[in-house]
Amino acid sequence: LVVDRGGHGRTLRTIADAYKVQALQGVRWTAWKALYAATRGAARALHLEHEIGSFEPGTLADVTVWDWAVGAVATHRDAVARDLHERVFAWMTLGDERNLAATWVAGRELYRRPGV
């Protein structure tokens, strides 16, 4: 699952679309599996898991900070979530580029939404 392509701004849409494809094929894809596919799993598929895809010391990291809920529907869904998995699932399936709060690349902050 490629979600780190610079500049496209549709990370959460990509994850949500992948979830839908999995569901249509009868595969139960949890929020944790989706996060793995977008991070460590993608690095592993490229045979780069020792260099990227995690926060382990010595690895390279581009970091994106997200707001949990932006907009009325997502805010309500976040408020009624029973656990962390439900919060992450709602964020992944209802979120979009408006949820982006800040981005760091190679240790430098490149973007911070006003008010964050």
Model-derived regions: residue spans:
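C-terminal cap of metal-dependent C-N hydrolases
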Residues: 60-115
